[in-house]
Structures are given as C-alpha cells and as structure tokens.
C-alpha cells in the first residue's frame, strides 16, 4: 500500500513538474513572439508614417515610367511589365500592425483572412504607373505569392476598388506550388510578350538567382547588376519582411522564435565604442 501511495505521489509530482515546464515554455515562447514583433515597430512606423517612405515609392514609380517609355522590344513582341503585389503595388502594413498589437508571427490562415477582408491600400505611385502602362501599348502582369486557390478573388476585388485597371483574371500569376517566380515569367514570355521591367520589393521578384540564398549572395547579385536598377529592375522599399530576412542565417525560417531573434542580433554590425 505504501509503495502504491509513493508511486501515485511521484506520478502526481511528475505531472505537476511537466505541466509547470510546459507552462514555462509557452510563456517563454509567447515572450519571444512579443519580442520578435516589437522589433518590427520602428520599420513599420517608417513605412506608415514617414514622408521618406512615400518619396522612395514615388521615386521608384517615376523611374519605372521613364524606363518603360524608353524600353524597346523585338519585332513581333508585345511589351510587358511584371510586378509583385505585396509591398510593391499593395500596402499591407495594417496587417503588420495587427501582428505587432497581438504579438502574432506570420500565419498563412491569418494572412488569408486579411486578404479576404479586402482592406489593402495602394503603394504611392502604383495605381498611376499600372494604368499608364496598360494604356500605352503595354501590359502589367501580377506575379505574386498570394495563393491562387484561396486569395485570388479578394486580391482582384481590392485592386479594382483601389483604381487599378487591367486586373482581369488572366493578368494574375499567383502561387500554385512554388514561391520562386522564374517559371511564371517564362509562361508570360510564351504568350509573345517581352518583359521590359521587373517591379518588386524583394530581389526574388527579379528571378531565381538568389532565391533562398544568404545575404552575402544577395548583396553580390546587386553589385553585379547595379546598372539594371532603375532601368530593368525597379525596387520598392520594404523594411518589414522579405527574402533578406531569411538571408540573415542558414535555415532562418526553420529556427524557433528564440533562434530567429539570435540570428537578427548576430547579424548586427556594431561599433566597439573605442
């Protein structure tokens, strides 16, 4: 009987300890999520509130218009522009604000709810550029990693509401399986188009060369192609997220929250104070 009581007490104690450990781990992970989201606040402030962000967006689209006007295509080819959507033509910063206020990491289901809410804003200059191209012997194609299966209708509705023209379903190349975009670019070219401009907020919007690569490779790509920026590649500012975040460390997006925080801090280049 005593042995049974001891075993029961030991089991109860073990369950209590394990429950306590689980609770501690949940609290620790919750704190880490809060820390990760709070690190995004200043960048979000910049994108939502600064004149500098708006100026850079207008600057990018002004350059895009000049580049489009000067671009020539081979005989028999049609002129095309491929554009990313999120943080390129569509401003989703209110979703990022919701993440900050609720200490929420990115979640695909939450993102789809945001798309369904149809509350995206237009990036400054995007509507005007889009409509200019579509009315001057060009065609804008939207190559985005929004999901083809669940996020197409919300996206099209939002863009119509915001004043984008040319947003018929055939202009959209959403994600079906792979995030890398080169295969979708090739599909557009097979229709007799020549892509004269790539517009995006992420180097991965310009092809697969540095897709999934570390930032050293991404910086090298920029240096090697410096003459194309403002002419063939139009880059929009995005301080909130992108391929550069995954480029901070090998396997960054497979790390837990604490690991991602450490990778961010490890990447900081700092003065030693001397």
From Swiss-Prot:
Signal peptide stretch: 1-20
Lipidation (N-palmitoyl cysteine): 21
Residue numbers with lipid attached (S-diacylglycerol cysteine): 21
One GO cellular component term noted in the UniProt record for this chain: cell outer membrane
Membrane topology classification: Lipid-anchor
Superkingdom of this protein's organism: Bacteria
Main location: membrane
SUPFAM superfamilies: HAD-like
Keyword Protease annotated: no
Name of the featured protein: Lipoprotein E
Organism: Haemophilus influenzae (strain ATCC 51907 / DSM 11121 / KW20 / Rd)
Gene: hel
